[in-house]
């Protein structure tokens, strides 16, 4: 083929595949959030004939809550994601980390009572840990009914790992396996370790401001006294600044920024994320800080832990110590060496491989013979 013929072919392909709008000189970036989210929505669109893309408001124990179900094949095993916080939703960042999951799982994201898209000032007084336990049971019942699958995988992150572990203990018959990411075991002990780590970092870095502020809340999380939220926020300020929430980053703002690009969220939803988290933390965190699963030493369901090596926000070392004592039909622990607390977005590739290679086969092992996704990718 001559050079002129090749050039003509390239030019023809260009005009065939690119619209005039894209060709316009200087028109190289989205002009608004709406345009940006439309691009992302197009990239993640599920186009398989049997595919499922559902985003709907569901009545959960009298409170309207948003649930999404996404899958290229709804026969694939269900994976319910229970977000952390309290109030730190995963749905609006799942466009980044979970698209690959949807090829092999039926992925369910749930914005918990009062969080994210489910924010409603009228239900603030109903935000209790007991109510959240009732809600997760109701959500699981709804998901089982809607998908026609009796068992599912439950992935709980951070605060969501408390709810998830509770379900695993009470209703192992509902689960193929429980997956804990940033697993909460004993919050008071985790807080103590976090304070000590932050103080040591401050000393080594010669950060006088950090040392002074951390010293101002000492002794921190000692005994059974209630931990004031103001003390918690100050401890977290320095834990996060020193990389204990996101590895080698001063905070998790990179993740928070991704919320604005979610195709599932309206502008109002994005604004409500921050209001909702403030309310959820105020209402739920005192009880979370007093919670402990350290005495739980046996589960009747396979357990997989995903832990960030540098997680100080919720002590991964404490979770590993607990896991060593735990008895379960099958258990595996996976370390994420380049992550702290936000491993889902810090190492999404390794998360995906772990889900495919280590989690997915458990659906077949627990009797889901119809599951299409249990065959690993070739």
Tell me what each language-model feature is.
Residues 176-221:
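A catalytic-pocket lid/entrance helix-loop region that shapes and gates access to the active site
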Residues 102-119:
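Conserved alpha/beta-hydrolase
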Residues 150-188:
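Conserved hydrolase catalytic core segment
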């Amino acid at each position: 083929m001559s050079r002129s013929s090749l050039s003509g072919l390239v030019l023809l392909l260009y005009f065939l595949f690119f619209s005039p709008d894209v060709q316009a000189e200087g028109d190289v970036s989205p002009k608004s959030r709406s345009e940006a989210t439309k691009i992302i929505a197009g990239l993640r669109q599920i186009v398989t004939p049997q595919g499922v893309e559902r985003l709907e408001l569901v009545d959960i124990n009298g409170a309207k809550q948003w649930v999404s179900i996404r899958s290229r094949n709804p026969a694939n095993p269900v994976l319910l994601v229970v977000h952390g916080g309290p109030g730190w939703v995963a749905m609006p960042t799942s466009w980044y980390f979970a698209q690959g999951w949807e090829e092999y799982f039926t992925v369910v994201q749930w914005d918990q009572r009062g969080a994210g898209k489910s924010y409603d000032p009228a239900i603030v007084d109903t935000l209790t840990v007991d109510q959240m336990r009732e809600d997760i049971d109701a959500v699981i019942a709804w998901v089982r009914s809607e998908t026609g699958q009796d068992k599912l995988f439950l992935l709980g992150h951070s605060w969501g790992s408390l709810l998830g572990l509770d379900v695993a203990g009470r209703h192992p018959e509902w689960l193929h396996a429980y997956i804990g990411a940033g697993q909460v075991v004993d919050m008071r002990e985790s807080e103590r370790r976090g304070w000590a780590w932050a103080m040591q970092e401050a000393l080594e870095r010669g950060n006088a401001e950090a040392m002074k502020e951390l010293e101002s809340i000492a002794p921190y999380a000692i005994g059974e006294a209630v931990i004031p939220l103001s003390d918690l926020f100050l401890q977290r300020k320095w834990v996060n600044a020193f990389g204990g929430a996101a590895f080698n980053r001063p905070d998790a703002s990179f993740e928070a920024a991704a919320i604005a690009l979610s195709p599932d969220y309206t502008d109002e939803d994005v604004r409500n994320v921050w209001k909702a988290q403030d309310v959820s933390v105020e209402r739920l965190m005192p009880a979370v800080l007093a919670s402990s699963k350290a005495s739980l030493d046996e589960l009747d369901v396979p357990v997989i832990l995903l832990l960030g090596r540098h997680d100080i926000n919720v002590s991964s070392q404490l979770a590993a110590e607990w896991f060593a004592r735990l008895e379960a039909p099958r258990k595996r622990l996976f370390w994420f060496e380049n992550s702290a607390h936000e491993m889902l977005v810090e190492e999404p590739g390794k998360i995906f491989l772990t889900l495919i290679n280590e989690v997915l086969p458990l659906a077949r092992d627990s009797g889901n013979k119809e599951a299409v996704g249990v065959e690993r990718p070739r």
